[in-house]
Amino acid sequence: MLNLYGRKFSSRLMLGTAQYPSPAILRNAIHKSNIEIVTVSLRRETAGGKQGGQFWQFLKELDITVLPNTAGCYTVKEAVTTAQLARDLFKTSWIKLEIIGNPDTLQPNVFSLIEAAQILNSDGFQIFAYTTDDLIVAERLLDVGCRVIMPWCAPIGSGQGPHNTDGLRSIRAYLPDVTLVIDAGIGRPSHAAVAMELGYDAVLLNTAVAKAGDPVLMAQAFAQAVQAGRMGYKAGILKARNIAVPSTPIVGKAVFS
């Protein structure tokens, strides 16, 4: 079971809710893949006006756990204010904390992230911290009270898959008891399987499903890939070798006459 701030979930795949062709397709993708958690931007709710309110009502009817996020924030003040508004709107202390440092790469501003996390933790929030694959940053986020760390594996929406598996593996090795979720950069089910094989606890993605030719089928594919990767990690994956090793042991040699 996936444990997030004391709450347990069966699914280790989380989905974003943006860019789907229609609400009906989003609903089917969630149901067919047995997703239990979706993330949604407060800015979508507020900027959308009446339409945003309708979307929130749509989410409530799905009877699913909502993880609000601070997507689109560039400063500590913006992120803190957005988180506080999200708590009022969604009635949850959960917040996926994102602070962007560069508008082109959408790379997290880890300095502002740590500062905002400290403020929000002192205000009672339970933070899911979207960050880079830097171990030192992850450790600092833990120091200020975060209990779920969400390293990216590649830039948001790029679909490139894990760039730095050594870095991701290092975070897992040094933080064995921390809940780690890969967030951003996943493009195909095999990427999700790799992330889970590294020992990560869950995967969060959006574009790879929302922009697929068949989002519902792709959501199912990702759900199965995440499950397979987790099972492989738990089973114990064979380490790669530089030389061939016979898979069938030879006891003696056949004698031909």
Curated annotation (Swiss-Prot):
UniProt KW keywords: Cytoplasm, Schiff base, Thiamine biosynthesis, Transferase
Gene Ontology biological process terms in this record: thiamine diphosphate biosynthetic process
Binding site for 1-deoxy-D-xylulose 5-phosphate: G157, A184, G185, N206, T207
Protein location: Cytoplasm
Domain of life: Bacteria
Gene3D superfamilies: Aldolase class I
Gene Ontology cellular component list: cytoplasm
EC number annotated for this UniProt entry: 2.8.1.10
SUBUNIT field: Homotetramer. Forms heterodimers with either ThiH or ThiS.
Reported function: Catalyzes the rearrangement of 1-deoxy-D-xylulose 5-phosphate (DXP) to produce the thiazole phosphate moiety of thiamine. Sulfur is provided by the thiocarboxylate moiety of the carrier protein ThiS. In vitro, sulfur can be provided by H(2)S.
Family: Belongs to the ThiG family.
Protein name as it appears in the record: Thiazole synthase
Organism name: Bartonella quintana (strain Toulouse)
Encoding gene (name): thiG
